[in-house]
Every structure is written in C-alpha cells, then in structure tokens.
A protein has these predicted regions:
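Short helix-initiation/N-cap motifs at beta->coil->alpha
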Residues: 107-116, 222-226, 320-334
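Extracytoplasmic "Venus flytrap"/periplasmic binding protein-like
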Residues: 90-169, 174-183, 202-204, 208, ...
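C-terminal lobe and pocket-closing loops
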Residues: 31-50, 58, 62-65, 348-357, ...
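Glycine-centered hinge/linker elements that transmit conformational signals in sensory
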Residues: 226-231, 273-322, 363-372
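Hinge/lid segment of periplasmic solute-binding proteins
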Residues: 29-65, 135-192, 243, 363-367, ...
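Short, well-ordered beta-strand elements
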Residues: 67-80, 101-106, 129-130
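Short, polar/charged alpha-helical segment
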Residues: 56-62, 80-100, 194, 198, ...
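Extracytoplasmic/periplasmic solute-binding protein
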Residues: 176-187, 191, 225-290
Length: 547
C-alpha cells in the first residue's frame, strides 16, 4: 500500500479508527487523533492523507453532514480507471463515507457531453447536479445562467481547502467568468514538446546528424523548422533498440472528435500571436476580429501553420490520421517516435513502466516558435531576431462546475473541493492514467512552487524526466504571450468545423488553404445563426477588447 503524505514532513499520530465501518464493510477512511484522515482509494487501496485543516471544519469522524443526499455528476466516458473519470470512481467511496451523501457518476462520450447536458438544462429535467466540463463549454453554461459562481464556497473554511492563488494567470482566467470563479481546480491543460533526450542528447547522434546534414542538431529545438528537420532525419531509421522495426520522427493523432485539432491550435500560435499591451485584431488575439467578428482562421499566419503541421505529419506513422489520443501516446511511450507534442499526461505516463519503455529518456520544453509571425493589423509578415514563442492552455482543463438547478450545490462543491486539495491533486498528477495534469503552484518545485523533488521521486518519477517536465510546463503557463482561449457560445461548433476540415487535410483530401477557407465560411454561418451582435459582444468581453 502506498501512503501519500502532505509534502514536507508529517508526524505520525495515533490511529483511532479501525478498518471496518459499522456493519462490517471495509472503510474507505482512517481517522487520526488530530482530526486528520486517510482517504483509501477504491480497488487500488492507495492512501491519501489530509490534515484536519485541509479537510475543512464541516467534516470529521462521525459527522457526515450530507447524510441521505444524492448528487449526479457528468464526466467523460473513460471508465473507472480512465482519464478524468477515473479519479471520481477511485475517490467516490471515501467521499461518500466522509459526507454521508451518494454520488452517481454519469459518463458521456466527449462528442455528446455538451449537447446532452444543455438539452437537460433547457428542458428543465435537472437530472444532473454538476458537470466536469471542458473549459470551452463555459460560455454555453454561464451566459444563460445554467451554472453558479463558487466564490462563497471557496471562502468558507468548512469545506476542503484549496487556494485560487495557486493558479498562474493563464489558468485562473479559464476558471472565471467576469471575475467570478465558476470552476474548481482539477486539471491544467496545455501542450508542450516532448522528445527522446537519450537520442537528441547523444553525442554520437549529434555527430552523425552534422555529418549527414551539414548542420548542428538544435538542442532543444527552438523553432518548428528545427522540429521538422530533426523529425525528417530520424524518420524511417531504426534509431531505438526496443525492436527491429523502423521508427518515426513524430507522432500525432487526427481522428475527428478525438481532440486532434488542438495540435493545430498549439502549433499555430507561433505564426499568429503577437504580444503587446492591448487587444485588437492582430495583438493578443487569434480567433475573430474583435471589432467585426470576422473569422481570422484563414489568415496567412494560420495558413502557414497548417502547411507546417501537414509537413511535420509526413514524418510520422501513416495511420496517425485515424488514430485517437491514446494510440498516439502509446506510440511515443513504446519508443517509436522522436517527438510528440501533447498534454501533461505524457510526462507522467512515461514513468509508468508497465506502459512505457522510455522512463529516464525524456526531454521537454515549451512549444517551439517561428522567426516570422503574421501581423494581422498591417497584413504583413514580420521577421524577428528571436523565435516568436507563445504559451497555451490548449485542451479541456477539465473542471467541475455546479448546475444552478441543483438542490444540493454545497454537496457538489464538497466533492470538487476535496479533489482540489493539495494531497488529492498531487496524487492525481503523479499518476498518468488520471488525465489530471500539473499547472499550479503546488505542483512546481521551489522557488516557483511548493512541491519537492523527493516527493515526485517517491511516487516513481525519474529525476531528469521530472526536471524537463516541470520546467516546460512552468514556462508554458507563465509565457509572456499566450494563445487566447475560446469559450464563447458556439465554441463547440466552431471547433467541430475546424476539426473536420483539418482531418480532411491530414488525410490528403483537402489542401490547407481550402480547409481553412471552408472553416472561415462555416464559422461565419455559425455566427450568423447564433446572432452576430451577441457573439461579437461576448467575444469582446472574453478577450478584453475595448472599442
């Protein structure tokens, strides 16, 4: 049995509760004389220790403040040990014993979750008390008043304790709406570049690369052109000794409705996002012209980005156009590609030797940049002395929100808050299968955070992998420029159109320009159908545009 303690030393105290509940059922809690408690996870029997202060004053041995109540929470259909849904299953018995309430976990396919929950809310069936949502759903939920702010619960010391000040500004923003918190800390999504450090850092391979290409191998890659050149060089070579087959330069995934379009968003920021102290068409902006709501998706910067993505994809497995996320990850974990750029799950999954062959061989960095960025204000390419690098919060940052129709909002919040406490959050980020990624202060190392190298190593991390991993994510979430996050009404529709057209490009049915021109047309149609004036007002508020 693995015991997780709060980072830092923790004195052992007298165990005062037995391992059985009344009635002889195995308990999921073990209480201590100081008011602390061990949460025992379902099936795995791992132990997460919370102090009395972390637990909150409403909860304690024998209290069960919500006895007899029941809540239903929707989440992605990943199963009892899958991403995002798995932690709910693993912590449900402990939470139920702690609160006295019952939790129904309602799993839904990613492509159906927003439509099903919105249908329920509009119809007034009120089947669900809360949603573990992708951050891009928030506009759909907030603007009609379907979810409630949680600031008053956060400030209440009775609930399990977590601190919004842990957030970097980039992540704080996507948990709030108009300055109020609607979502609770859970997952921190952003994409970084991963590579095989044992290969790219090898003097033998560096020498061979220079002999064969006449150039030094960039280490780490600074631009997307560097990534393409290196991927091209290694593609088709058997550079990894895990098998006798040829290996690839990169791996991605592009199956429709499997989040493949996020590859394009993250990569394209280097060619499109220009920083500054304002927001306008070409500054700190990406999606639409904030003065007119004209889509910018087919601008030259976006076009070059898609051409770059397509070129890079040629140095990966031919089948990746039909792959889902997990299949692409496993290709990298098996040692079959030099590069993958993806979410934080990869860094922790690399440590799982039942799934990974590359523990101790990982490199990672903030996503590469471009020496040219397209200025959408002046309609020209700008050449730079240093690569244009932008951070991102690409992905779902899957977060708990509470239905305004719930009769038990405080019960829902108690579940979310428990998941957000430092011990539970650290338990999550140390296990790649949970889908919960690092991104806040408690996950980073001093002097920028409060976690410890030893704590991660005890949980199975290789120290070299860890240092690359956390440095990449800190630089990503605290980057000077960030890819703006789209959360307005219709985001799901806008992104679905982009996803489908990108897939057509990746399988060779459509040229990049045609794909983005079609997306431009479809985005205009979505905007008109939803009401251009309303969409424009919401977009202006979302990006901070001042007319």
């Amino acid at each position: 049995m693995k015991i997780l303690k709060n980072l830092g030393s923790l004195a052992f105290v007298l165990l005062i509760a037995g391992s059985l509940q009344a009635g002889g059922h195995a308990s999921s809690l073990k209480w201590y004389s100081d008011g602390g408690v061990d949460l025992i996870t379902f099936e795995d029997k791992e132990v997460i220790h919370l102090s009395k202060e972390q637990l909150g004053s409403y909860f304690g041995k024998g209290k069960q403040p919500y006895k007899g109540k029941k809540i239903a929470i929707t989440v992605n259909n990943s199963g009892p040990k899958g991403g995002i849904s798995g932690p709910l299953h693993r912590l449900r018995p402990a939470w139920e014993e702690l609160t006295g309430a019952k939790l129904e976990i309602v799993e839904m396919p990613l492509a159906e979750q927003l439509s099903k929950t919105m249908f329920d809310l509009r119809l007034g069936s009120n089947q669900y008390d809360g949603f573990i949502e992708g951050a891009w759903y928030m506009g759909e939920y907030v603007t009609p008043g379907y979810i409630i702010p949680v600031d008053k619960y956060i400030a209440d010391p009775g609930f399990p304790q977590w601190d919004p000040d842990w957030f970097p500004p980039s992540l704080r923003e996507i948990h709030q709406w108009n300055g109020e918190f609607y979502a609770v800390l859970n997952d921190s999504d952003g994409q970084v570049l991963y590579w095989r450090q044992d290969i790219l850092g090898s003097k033998e391979w560096q020498t061979r690369y220079k002999q064969d290409t006449g150039k030094e191998m960039p280490q780490p890659p600074k631009t997307w052109r560097d990534v393409i050149d290196i991927a091209k060089y290694f593609d088709g070579k058997n550079w990894d000794d895990n098998d006798a087959e040829e290996d690839d330069g990169v791996v991605m995934h592009f199956r429709v409705n499997e989040q493949g379009m996020f590859h394009f968003m993250s990569l394209s920021a280097a060619f499109t996002v220009m920083g500054g102290d304002t927001v306008d068409r070409g500054t700190n902006n990406y999606w639409f012209d904030p003065a007119t709501m004209e889509p910018l998706i087919n601008q030259p910067g976006h076009g070059r980005a898609l051409e770059t993505l397509y070129e890079l994809s040629q140095y990966g497995p031919a089948a990746q156009s039909a792959w889902d996320l997990g299949t692409a990850w496993d290709w990298f974990l098996r040692g079959k590609s030099i590069f993958v750029f993806s979410w934080g799950d990869v860094g922790s999954l690399v440590q799982d030797e039942s799934r990974s062959k590359i523990k101790g061989k990982l490199g990672a960095s903030v996503l590469p940049g471009s020496y040219e960025v397209y200025d959408m204000n002046n309609n020209r390419w700008v050449k730079l002395d240093k690569p244009n690098v932008a951070g991102n919060t690409t992905g779902g940052s899957w977060q708990g929100v509470i239905s305004a129709k719930s009769k038990n909002p405080e019960v829902v919040y108690s579940l979310y808050a428990l998941m957000a406490t430092q011990p539970v959050s650290m338990w999550n980020v140390n296990r790649g299968w949970t889908g919960v990624d690092p991104g806040v202060k408690i996950h980073f190392l001093p002097p920028v955070g409060s976690a410890s190298v030893l704590g991660y190593i005890k949980e199975g991390f290789h120290e070299s992998d860890l240092m690359y991993y956390l440095d990449a994510y800190h630089k990503n979430f605290f980057a000077d420029k960030m890819l703006p996050y789209l959360r307005i009404n219709g985001t799901e529709e806008y992104w679905r159109a982009l996803d489908q057209n990108l897939s057509e490009t990746m399988i060779g049915r459509m040229q990049p320009k045609e794909a983005l021109d079609r997306t431009y047309k479809e985005w205009n149609e979505i905007t008109e159908r939803r009401g251009k004036a309303k969409q424009l007002k919401q977009y202006q508020e979302a990006v901070g545009y001042k007319n």
